[in-house]
Amino acid sequence: MTQTFSNGDTPQDHSETSSTAPDVVIITGMSGAGRTEAMHTFEDLGYFCIDNLPPSLIMNMISLASLPGQNEIGRKLAIVCDARNREYFKQLVGELANMEAAGVTFRVIFLDAADSILIARYKASRRRHPLCINNKRSIGQAISYERSLTQELRSLADSYIDTSNMSPRELREELRRLYSKQTAKEGMNVTVYSFGFKHG
């Protein structure tokens, strides 16, 4: 299913800034839903990508990227934010509000997948879910907990992508189609897609 929102009807109408301010994309969502693949895609699109940056440092990074003399790469930032704890996401939501109040142009991408798909991916990769602390939570319990942590952030997303039935290549293609030319356009449309991620 595809839903398209015009500029006046976007779920998040973030303000435009001066030409020296960077274009910022926040990549977040469920662990195992494709955040790393998304980060590599934005690297290919010429973004300077940062993984696991503490929310309290996001505005500092944006300020540095806004300084005169920055090259083109420094004008485009993609920041990956993953599961930590409830306080982490509370800080991230607060930082997004600060960014909007400061007039920073940014978009939030939330990547998701069905619980059964996420469980299968973790079992196939033999990796431990980041919220399976000392194996006190099963994978299913960790995923359920992560959903509760990310619920508010998901509601703030400009783009929601369900990767349950999508291959890594398909995810890359969709992100390129959505962001390769539109990120720098003023008055752009925001398109929300629901897809999937076939093999993790």
Predicted regions and their residues:
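Conserved nucleotide-sensing/catalytic segment adjacent to the nucleotide-binding pocket
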Residues: E43-A97
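A glycine- and Lys/Arg-enriched "phosphate-lid" helix/loop adjacent to the NTP-binding pocket
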Residues: V104-L149, S159, S164-N165
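Conserved glycine(s) of the Walker
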Residues: G34
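Extreme N-terminal, non-catalytic leader segments
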Residues: M1-D23, L57-L67
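Post-Walker A alpha-helix
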Residues: A38-M39
